[in-house]
């Protein structure tokens, strides 16, 4: 029987010399107490050594996944097939794969496990040609490599480098700004016109470093640094300059400062390229969405890429504007719409009225990109490119929405609505609460009110008529009494057939009398008088 034994140095295949002693499982460990006893049980038949740690890592990752490495396949075909003996393996899954692909009989049992323990205890004596120090070094290196592989760890994906690089880049910008401002003020006493002619700071320092004193500009060749027109202007200004004379020691110190500025500028460009490469390695999708600098500042502000991935989109949107946020919450005003994400190119190219909306959408897509870069296995930037294209299309639709045709239809014309202030008080209309019809009731009530008004008016008119008729009747009765008394005095006997009015008679009889009868009665009274 053959035994396949894997080590950190290579593959070892042993030949079992005495298979009878394998039957006693409990006492098998006694046979491996010393290297001499172990050599009586097993003997090394073949040893396939690994060339380096990378090869060992590939072999062991294949064994962990239950696969056969190419190197192992060659060894098994060469040695085990020729021997025509069963193969003892430590992993039952690996034995099944070997049996399936190479058609070799494999054994896995408690006896094999005990045999593997014995071989491992006397490995230095059973495998000649391998020093213990080399074995320990290979074992340690393989353990570290295997741990990195299991944890998906990569040295290129350490976001601490990004945090330090962006912090250093900001510090360099501040130092460069201070140095250049000091250099311009310092050399401005000697040649003040040069600062107005050359606006670029790096070119300004290179000119100073090349020329030095103002008197040397007439003979200096600045064609490598400046265009011909600017060079001629500088030389003309140097001849009629209003600056004061300075000593050689002052010029030396100014030139030394210019050298510092140029070196720091070159290092800054190198650091920026390093930051770009790191960002594309660690967070490619975030880099596509917001750019290298904004992405690095977001990671540095959160502390790490994993901490940033735990933030919500609303938090990422205002990350960097904490002072303004707490100030707004304290004074109960509107909170800020954006923080560090404001410096992204998508937000910068948007019109002011759409900046808040675009920053919100960009924050949502950026959070997806951050989580994909932090927890995803794929290191491509395809998702970031796709999401950026969607945001750019959305931005175009927002920008085109405000453009209307001059001779447009009613749809194109904007509807002006009445402005209502927030503090305007609105009353509640309870008419919408009832589900019963209210129109018929209102109409009935209105009709009843109108009828009541008509009846009241008629009653008032009737009362007025009755009063007028009563007054007329009283006048007529008084006139008749006076006429009867006069007739008695004159002795005229006239038979007047009149029925006395009773108090109980209805007063409507006189009211029915026509106006013609009244006229006749008046004429009679006049004749009698």
UniProtKB/Swiss-Prot annotation:
PTM annotation (Phosphoserine): residues: 109, 304, 351, 483, 502, 514
Biased composition (Acidic residues): 469-481
Record PTM: Sumoylation is essential for high-affinity binding to snoRNAs.
InterPro entries for this protein: Nop56/Nop58, NOP58/56_N, Nop_C, Nop_dom, Nop_dom_sf, NOSIC
Keywords assigned: Isopeptide bond, Nucleus, Phosphoprotein, Ribonucleoprotein, Ribosome biogenesis, Ubl conjugation
Modified residues (Phosphothreonine): 34
Main subcellular location: nucleus
GO cellular component, one term: nucleoplasm
The keyword NADP belongs to this UniProt entry's keyword annotation: no
Cross-link (Glycyl lysine isopeptide (Lys-Gly) (interchain with G-Cter in SUMO1)): 467
Tissues expressing this chain: Ubiquitous.
Disordered: region residues: 409-529
Location(s), subcellular: Nucleus, Nucleolus; Nucleus, Nucleoplasm
Keyword Ribosomal protein among record annotations: no
Cross-link Glycyl lysine isopeptide (Lys-Gly) (interchain with G-Cter in SUMO2), where in sequence: 157, 353, 411, 415, 422, 426, 441, 444, 465, 467, 485, 497
Top-rank lineage group of the source organism: Eukaryota
Recorded consequence of changing residue 283 to P: Restricted to nucleoplasm. Abolishes interaction with NOPCHAP1
Gene Ontology MF term list: ATPase binding; RNA binding; snoRNA binding; TFIID-class transcription factor complex binding
Domain Nop, first and last residues per copy: 282-400
Compositionally biased tracts (Basic and acidic residues): 414-427
Family: Belongs to the NOP5/NOP56 family.
Function: Required for the biogenesis of box C/D snoRNAs such as U3, U8 and U14 snoRNAs. Part of the small subunit (SSU) processome, first precursor of the small eukaryotic ribosomal subunit. During the assembly of the SSU processome in the nucleolus, many ribosome biogenesis factors, an RNA chaperone and ribosomal proteins associate with the nascent pre-rRNA and work in concert to generate RNA folding, modifications, rearrangements and cleavage as well as targeted degradation of pre-ribosomal RNA by the RNA exosome.
Protein name listed in UniProt: Nucleolar protein 58
Organism: Homo sapiens (Human)
Protein's gene: NOP58
